[in-house]
């Protein structure tokens, strides 16, 4: 199993991605090809004592797509950008999966232009796992495309169901449409048009509308929405989790001696809670609907997140999620005809 890692264009630079890849090779026994500035990568491999590891190779790329560049234009003009080169390796079957934590827009554009969509898939979707009271809930789309037609939402539900079954190991995952109320008559034009289509899709277990407050309750396993709403939900959740942990810490530190003693007693529990809420524990988000396994990580990902993302990428490839999605999309289309 060989995983390509685009090590350029992130908040912390290549060091965290290279370290994460090195740790993944040690922990999971996979091969990795590190794509980016060869000189920088080689220096980091020497630093981490991995320059002689035969399972780690380097593929030089001289350009980087910055976060503020227009994704489609940059992907077309910067042929030697690390994400474009890495996507080319994926397209040519020189690796089994790709992990990137650079520009999300550039990653999606590279996936579309260089790798291509699964036959029958109209729009890819980013599937992001988030913690819930009952385990993990996947939200999609969380940013691949800000606008979505009802048919795109249906395909997201189908792909999200496959993700929940194969990656999260959930039997008959429940699917919910994110809305402002549970009633079938609630919502904007998009929601009202999407609801009956989901209801009639026999390849998913659709239970109806869910509200924002229901996501973390674990009422459903798959939450379907457009990329604009999904991205807002995701980032709000990340910010809220950090705020809650900060408020707890401040309450303990400012609450006097009893609060501090109580804090010591619950410290192990708080560490467990922090770990469960940490996005790094989930690795990255899956870009579903592309013809090969493609993982998108947070721009601020550190080594731990990259190591976990590589593990997810391996699982994605081993479970042959791409082929299953292709079959499910085709099956759904046949049922409607």
Where are these regions (language model features)?
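Glycine-rich phosphate/diphosphate-binding loop of Rossmann-like nucleotide-binding domains
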Residues: 15-16, 31-33, 39, 146-212, ...
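Phosphate/nucleotide-donor binding subsite
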Residues: 50-95
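Glycine-rich phosphate/nucleotide-binding loop
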Residues: 112-125, 131-139, 219-223, 227-336
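Short, glycine-rich nucleotide/cofactor-binding loops
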Residues: 5-15, 144-154, 296-301
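Short helix-capping segments at alpha-helix termini
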Residues: 25-28, 46-55, 168, 198-204
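N-terminal phosphate-binding or glycine-rich loops at protein starts, especially the Walker A/P-loop
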Residues: 1-42
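Short glycine/serine/threonine-rich phosphate/pyrophosphate-binding segments
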Residues: 13-17, 80-93, 97-111, 122-127, ...
């Amino acid at each position: 199993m060989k995983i390509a890692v685009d090590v350029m264009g992130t908040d912390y630079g290549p060091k965290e991605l290279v370290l994460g890849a090195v740790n993944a090779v040690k922990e999971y026994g996979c091969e990795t090809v590190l794509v980016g500035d060869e000189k920088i990568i080689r220096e980091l491999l020497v630093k981490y004592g991995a320059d002689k590891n035969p399972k780690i190779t380097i593929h030089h790329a001289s350009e980087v797509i910055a976060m503020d560049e227009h994704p489609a234009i940059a992907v077309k003009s910067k042929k030697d950008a690390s994400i474009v080169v890495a996507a080319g390796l994926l397209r040519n079957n020189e690796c089994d999966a790709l992990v990137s934590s650079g520009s999300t827009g550039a990653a999606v554009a590279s996936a579309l232009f260089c790798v291509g969509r699964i036959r029958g898939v109209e729009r890819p979707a980013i599937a992001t796992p988030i913690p819930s009271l009952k385990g993990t809930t996947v939200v999609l789309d969380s940013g691949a495309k800000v606008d979505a037609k009802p048919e795109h939402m249906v395909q997201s539900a189908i792909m999200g169901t496959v993700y929940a079954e194969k990656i999260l190991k959930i039997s008959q995952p429940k699917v919910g449409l994110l809305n402002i109320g549970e009633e079938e008559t609630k919502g904007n034009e998009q929601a009202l048009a999407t609801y009956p289509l989901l209801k009639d899709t026999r390849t998913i277990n659709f239970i109806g509308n869910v509200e924002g407050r229901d996501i973390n309750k674990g009422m459903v396993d798959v939450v379907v929405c457009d990329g604009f709403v999904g991205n807002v939900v995701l980032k709000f959740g990340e910010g809220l989790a950090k705020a809650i942990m900060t408020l707890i810490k401040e309450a303990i530190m400012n609450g006097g001696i009893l609060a501090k003693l109580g804090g010591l007693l619950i410290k192990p529990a708080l560490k467990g809670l922090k770990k469960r809420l940490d996005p790094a524990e989930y690795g990255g988000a899956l870009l579903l609907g592309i013809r090969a396994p493609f993982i998108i990580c947070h721009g601020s990902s550190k080594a731990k997140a990259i190591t976990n993302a590589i593990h997810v990428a391996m699982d994605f490839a081993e479970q042959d999620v791409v082929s299953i999605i292709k079959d499910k999309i085709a099956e759904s289309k046949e049922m409607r005809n």
